[in-house]
Amino acid sequence: MRVRGIERNCQNLWKWGIMLLGILMTCSNADNLWVTVYYGVPVWKEATTTLFCASDAKSYKTEAHNIWATHACVPTDPNPQEIELENVTENFNMWRNNMVEQMHEDIISLWDQSLKPCVKLTPLCVTLNCIDEVMENVTMKNNNVTEEIRMKNCSFNITTVVRDKTKQVHALFYRLDIVPIDNDNSTNSTNYRLINCNTSAITQACPKVSFEPIPIHYCAPAGFAILKCRDKRFNGTGPCTNVSTVQCTHGIRPVVSTQLLLNGSLAEEEIIIRSENLTNNAKIIIVQLNESVAINCTRPYRNIRQRTSIGLGQALYTTKTRSIIGQAYCNISKNEWNKTLQQVAIKLGNLLNKTTIIFKPSSGGDPEITTHSFNCGGEFFYCNTSGLFNSTWDISKSEWANSTESDDKPITLQCRIKQIINMWQGVGKAMYAPPIEGQINCSSNITGLLLTRDGGTNNSSNETFRPGGGDMRDNWRSELYKYKVVKIEPLGVAPTRAKRRVVEREKRAIGLGAMFLGFLGAAGSTMGARSLTLTVQARQLLSGIVQQQNNLLRAIEAQQHLLQLTVWGIKQLQARILAVERYLKDQQLLGIWGCSGKLICTTTVPWNSSWSNRSLNDIWQNMTWMEWEREIDNYTGLIYRLIEESQTQQEKNEQELLELDKWASLWNWFNITQWLWYIKIFIMIVGGLIGLRIVFAVLSLVNRVRQGYSPLSFQTLLPAPRGPDRPEGIEEEGGERGRDRSIRLVNGFSALIWDDLRNLCLFSYHRLRDLILIAARIVELLGRRGWEALKYLWNLLQYWSRELKNSASSLLDTIAIAVAEGTDRVIEIVRRACRAVLHIPTRIRQGLERLLL
């Protein structure tokens, strides 16, 4: 009885142990997290890439020799997309923006390429015999300012087509373009040379070259995007909370100018002051106006151009004669300018905590810096801006300290024209601009200022600002301050409870990918948000790339008649190759990971809590993909490597599994092509067994010899059991009971093979029989134990059901009894109260009777 009790207790412990183990396994599996690959997530990283251009050059001018060469650009999108990114904050830095450097290099390349086929003026570096051109002093219109227009009538010898012969020609040069030889500045000097002959290589601009700036849109190739800050008061650096994504920038006019920014974009609300460090006087200050100020420039006199041959196939274009009407000038409305400058002064005073803002002219330097230099109708103007920057603003009194006139009389800027221009691209380069025939008029809008602050340790309340410029990067920076280029990373990894269970052997579809622009609209959504539709996003990448490549090819085909591509053509080729490379790289990674054609791909790589110990709910409900990518960025390479190793191992397992497919059909087992393979395997097995038998026989003989047994030969008989009628041993020695009689060890090679095969078959039969009996016993025990466990669980369920039912009934009975008792007590209390009230008159009467008695 005691044994049976112990057996029953052990059975109960066994059952409870199995149940506990199952619960633990379930709980442990529920907490396991696995790496899952997502394709099409809205994640980006800062990057530097080759941008290409888009422009509507043909709609502006059909001039084939425009210096900006925008005819090689892709046509602009008639319906550009701008997708707002909600709940996204991105850092911008206009002073560390590669787009500015790239635009600067592009514009330099365009200038150099446009001037490359033009005439070099090295043969013109000769002695010029010049005299003053007979001119009169002229009065500038609307300003009553008289100034002498200085030009020199020069004669010089040039080489004709026949190189050993020269001829003398005459031409008019501006006084600013020539200098006396040997620095003789006397008024009586007659020997001159071109100003840049001893320092720069001078190239004459081609006569048909146009300098009219045409808006250029910079576009990102497929796989990249341009982020745009839409904060109306963004100062160019720091975080921006209102971010959108665009494929191309707005149209940027590459206007080369100093001091004043022309034909740019305006601020939407108030004037914006931008500087890398406002307290550092060495840093340029870029002012973006909120209202433009018109500037109208005129060259009233009419030049007559002449063509002079200076060699075989080369010609010099100079001024032959001109009609004198007046000096070149520019007009600006005084009221508009003073109003604008007043707002700028208030803004600067508030930023620097100064009460008085002083504007003064440039302190000196090259003409390009001390004046407002720009191109007007093909001529290069150098205008004196001392009339614009010569005022003082008292912020405390909100008035001009040197009260200016309030009339609307325009401010007239005196302008000089130069034909030999120092190239802004670098030192040692100069350009000769041929004179333009006829009268020149141009109108522009002042949209910004370039200022510098005077230095010193003055702690007073005054601050002085002067016009600056000269570095064209600041001109491009004033337009590109709100853009940055990012590289889209459509591949993302995150932990989930899903694990790749089986190896699929069907064909996989070709993947598409994630749209390089459209899907970024979901960047502010959480990782588990329903708005993140990966399927829609993934279908757009390849079609977007194809469309973009078609546009690039059309632009490149338009240039095939040229002997060499412009800088835009080269960039289009680079963008085309880069887009395909980006797509193929992502597809290669997906293929290596076994995720081709899948937007959500589970893996067998367990998630390591050291990568991120956040809970699954916290990751998918509270974090965006950008935040998640920043958190695991240091471990992305490790995760990718583990996924690759896991997929490699899975492919090996798959290969081994596929190798067993030829045994899937029973008929294949009897295929005649397999017979030779069967025979080979059979021979190998038999040979191995025979060899093993021989080895063990030799080892047995060696062992017997060591024990003192010396067989005469391989025919030595082994002891065999005696019969019951034979005596055990001889008389002298007696016999050992149980000794076997001798049998032959071997009897030829055939007998050896037969014995081995027979023993092998018997051994296999006995072992298989034992194995089958053991397996049957195990199955029987497992079935019995399983059935008992099921019956126990069923009885346990019935027991707890009865207990719950009884408990519920008892609870209801108890509640009913308590309610009944409470109700009876309440009724009794109410009844006694009513009875007491009813007996009040009786008690009063009884009291009165006692008093009367």
From Swiss-Prot:
Residues 703-853 are cytoplasmic. Residues 362-372 are annotated as: CD4-binding loop. SUPFAM superfamilies: gp120 core, Virus ectodomain. Keywords: AIDS, Apoptosis, Clathrin-mediated endocytosis of virus by host, Cleavage on pair of basic residues, Coiled coil, Disulfide bond, Fusion of virus membrane with host endosomal membrane, Fusion of virus membrane with host membrane, Glycoprotein, Host cell membrane, Host endosome, Host membrane, Host-virus interaction, Lipoprotein, Membrane, Palmitate, Signal, Transmembrane, Transmembrane helix, Viral attachment to host cell, Viral envelope protein, Viral immunoevasion, Viral penetration into host cytoplasm, Virion, Virus endocytosis by host, Virus entry into host cell. Residues 130-153 are annotated as: V1. Residues 571-589 are annotated as: Immunosuppression. A motif (Di-leucine internalization motif) lies at residues 852-853. The chain crosses the membrane at residues 682-702. Residues 509-529 are annotated as: Fusion peptide. Disulfide bonds join 53-73, 118-206, 125-197, 130-154, 219-248, 229-240, 297-330, 376-442, 383-415, 595-601. This is Envelope glycoprotein gp160. It comes from Human immunodeficiency virus type 1 group M subtype D (isolate Z2/CDC-Z34) (HIV-1). The lineage of its organism: Viruses, Riboviria, Pararnavirae, Artverviricota, Revtraviricetes.
